[in-house]
Amino acid sequence: MSMKTATIHRPGTLPFVRFCGYFAVIAGLLGILAGLRLIDKNPNLAELLYVAIDLCLLFAILGWHLHQQNKVGSVGLAGFFLAFTGTGFIAGPSAKIFGFTAYSLGIPVVALGLLTMSWCALRRRAIPGWILSAFGLSLAIMILSFYLPWLYQPISFFNIVFSIGFLGLGYTLIKEH
């Protein structure tokens, strides 16, 4: 009788990156649901949805980095650290740091990290350009929504466009790994 041994895959190998791709797809689908603002009337359910999205985003960002780590160098690594750390701020408790909420500190850190990762990916053609455009457009929509509230009410165009980017990222990670 022979025993089959389990294959152990370390992070950065193909199955793990594909696994992270599924989390990117889940984050994208849940983000679109959040963007449609159908559950905003139930604050507990809305909070649970955003926690699930943020946790999925952590895996999605990790998978994205592992997918392109050999192509983007130290600048790409810095972008990953910023995006991952900023998402941790957003997903974590709403503590105040230097008078600011963790969420308000996390958003610009995530944005800077994702823009850096996108710029590196674009230069090295590591991810399809339309995905990177979705991230850039979502940042522009987020900034404009401070001045044009109709971009956020009754639906969040930022969430929808941002989430479409993660759907595409997830599809790419799954397809290529």
Regions found by a protein language model. Give the residues of each.
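Hydrophobic, aromatic-enriched alpha-helical segments typical of multi-pass transmembrane helices
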Residues: S2-H177
